[in-house]
Amino acid sequence: MTTVVKAQRRRAVIASTVGTTIEWYDFFLYGTAAALVFPTVFFPDQSAFAGVLAAFGTQFVGFAARPIGAAIFGHYGDRVGRKAMLVTTLMLMGVGTFLIGLLPSTKSIGLVAAVLLVLLRIVQGIGVGGEWGGSVLLSMEWGSARRRGFMASWPQVGVPLGLLLSTGMVKLMSGLTGDSFLTWGWRVPFLVSIVLVGIGLYVRLNVLESPDFEEVKKTRTVHRAPVLEVIKSQPLEILTSAFVRMAEQAPFYLFITFVLTYGTKQLELTRDSLLNDTLIAAAIGLVSVPFFGFLSDVIGRRLMYGIGIVCVGAFAFPYFSLLNTKNSGLVLVAIVVSLICHDMMYGPQAALIAESFGTNVRYSGAGLGYQLASVIAGGPAPLIAAAILKSTGSSTGISWYIVGCAVVSMTALLLMPRRAVSDRSAADDLMAAEPVAR
């Protein structure tokens, strides 16, 4: 039994991480294209600023769809199981991304192009909205109770890895296609995603269901309407889970998406230099995210998360000061440090939120709380930053916006109910069920 559990534990981590990597590759690819490509391809008749706002607006639509995905897949994930939902969410994201790569431009088919872009972005948003809860729970629930932070952090590694792959693909195609990048080169990274989806499906189909969920089915404690149940019984947990992400979610999309627009348009930095800096920061995240998840098992999730909140708030003004020097070395420092501060929260975040909910409503509750932050923080952030920059002509207001997000997060962290979590998991019980095979 011990050997089987260890093997499944590895498979669960790999399946969760590979899947989230592919889904975040798809999602970040859209964000990068929204900053560099879509204003020209889908909104050519707008002014430069209006085109950027319109492109970021379509990006926000995807964020708005994420709570819908969390509710739909949370319902079935708490009733049917984690594994089946993860296969479905991966297919949704993959098909949506592939079809974006086939979309004609506005010059070819008019306004219909922008409408189709929005519809496919909604499909992406629903897919990624259902993805997070299932991937985190599959990994965390196969792990030891003493290592929940570390186990739950591995699906989070899909974010820097997806960012690394998407940014790398955009940079590669930008270099290979040159002036043709805005006509057809940008499409290749979207089309390639279908191959990655095939790999992800193979991996996910070969992992067993979470032992915690199997225990829920065995004890017949599955709720008929888990989404309604968790909204009724744990509204404070949902709200604090959402608002605790303000300092992580909003600044993150400024650090990886808005910075491309700000750097190229406002500071006249090159697109390639900014993409290179993002690649370096994302590579560091492959280590820093699981490290901070592990550290949260040692010093406590709330303390680790609180340190990250303070770090992001304290770096808000130095971040733009370093960018505004236009010095390549200092710009790199700004981007790397900002994402390390983010990772201090992102590593322990999955376990922090998931542990707030019981197993029979965990997919629904954790998913809803997590994805609500996408609407109130992540989605509007580039739009708010662009509007502040347009009205003031300065980055100072954006720094204050980041500080405000940190204050909201710290307040939510202090208000977050403490839930007694068992010092054993179903996987621990399976490990103890039989002696180690000799």
Model-predicted segments: where are they?
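C-terminal ends and interior cores of transmembrane alpha-helices
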Residues: M91-I109, V310-T325
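Glycine-rich segments within core transmembrane alpha-helices of 12-TM secondary carriers
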Residues: G149-S174, Y370-A381
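Multi-pass alpha-helical transporter architecture, strongest
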Residues: G200-V207, G404-L430
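Extracytoplasmic gate region of multi-pass secondary transporters
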Residues: G31, P235-I284, G378-A381
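C-terminal transmembrane helical hairpin of 12-TM major facilitator-type secondary transporters
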Residues: R302-P348
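Cytoplasmic membrane-interface "Motif A"-like loop-to-helix N-cap segments
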Residues: R79-M91, V298-I309
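Helix-loop-helix hairpin linking two adjacent transmembrane segments in secondary transporters
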Residues: V159-R204
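Helix-to-loop junctions at the C-terminal end of transmembrane segments
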Residues: A70-R82, V289-G300
